[in-house]
Curated annotation (Swiss-Prot):
Species, as recorded: Aeromonas hydrophila subsp. hydrophila (strain ATCC 7966 / DSM 30187 / BCRC 13018 / CCUG 14551 / JCM 1027 / KCTC 2358 / NCIMB 9240 / NCTC 8049)
Database matches in Pfam families: SDH_alpha (PF03313)
GO aspect biological process, one term: L-cysteine catabolic process to pyruvate
Molecular function GO labels: L-cysteine desulfhydrase activity
Name listed for the protein in its UniProt record: UPF0597 protein AHA_4077
Family: Belongs to the UPF0597 family.
Amino acid sequence: MRHIAMKAQWTDFITLLKREVVPALGCTEPMSVALAAANCRKLLGQVPTRVSVWVSGNLFKNGMGVGVPGTGMIGLPVAAAVGITGGNPDAGLEVLKALTPAQVEEAKVLLPAIKVDVKDVPDVLYAEVLAQVEGHSARVVICTDHTRIILMERDGEVLMAQDSAPGVQIQAAPSSKPAMTLREIVEFALQVPLAEIDFIREAATMNQALADEGLQGYGLRIGKILTEQVERKLLSDDLMTLAMRLSSAASDARMDGAMLPAMSNSGSGNQGIAATMPVVAAARFLQASDEQLTRALVMSHLVAIYIKTYQNKLSALCAASTAAMGAGAAITWLLGGQFEQISHCINNMIGDVSGIICDGAGSACSMKVSTSTSAAVKSSLMAINNLHVPQSEGIVSDDVDQTIANLGRLSKQGMLDTDIEIINIMRAKQQGKAE
């Protein structure tokens, strides 16, 4: 194979992948609260007697009903409690990796002293924890990114503060375009020297372990149920079923608090699962080589990041469905498709699943991951037969990059009221006032 020189953009792509595809233990929104709480405990030097937590509406939405790893419990108060009693303030999204049963019991005692409320802030991702004990206090604020601490205070003294605008933005401003195109991503994935992207294989290893755990029976048991139906001959042991089984099983385990990390994408474990496991399933089913799997995973994850750049970090649009579009692109390539067919696949998926809402993280996420995975396989099979949604329909354009931008516009501008109503409904449920 001839040597291909690295392009400057390719180096940027590798940096982007290494920043956005990282391990995360537990749903990332509660982990932000746990991380802030763990840092409060570090500043105080002791367990507080009162803890106040304020979060953005979107973080509240994604933390209300999801399992906290190692606890058997759900919700943001639990995340704050175990963050204080057993969180590692230096471990980022793996803040609860070393949590012990004794620390969980200690957290249960602390739970009545924890209050969580929604704060009206401009940032969709915001977590603030104030911990108090015997005349002392500590405050930590995380903003714009799941692990980005922008404020640390002890006894009212500011120890660290920075502007809430991120130092490195991956999200596109409404009037700007990301510094990449789908064609550039595909070219990179297929031509970059293999040694430069070998690291992406860890996503397959990590998320496969999560899928194996999920098949034991977690959450809604979607992956386990699908597997049982294959054994009963009610479902075929085909590509689509395998992809759905592995993807939903990994999500089942993650959403139900399994003590295993997921390789995330753009700050979300389910996005990482949706970008990884359908590709792993396709590579296994098609008996692809290690190199093919590696390049397919890079294509999938980078496409998922690209599509996400047009959207807010948290929104009313299910991000697992958009991450699965990356998987669809990679599966199309594994099936022999070229750039034209890869474009068709993404257009097909946007024409199919672009309306799935995010009504918070929870066990039902595995259903949405499963649905999006099936759409990825279906769209790939259509694409390699040169079948695609025509540009005359809906938000689909002949130019796939424009279609992706249209989806971002739908998410970022068109679904704002949807997001508000979802949050209002969930808050009313929590307060026992849902009508």
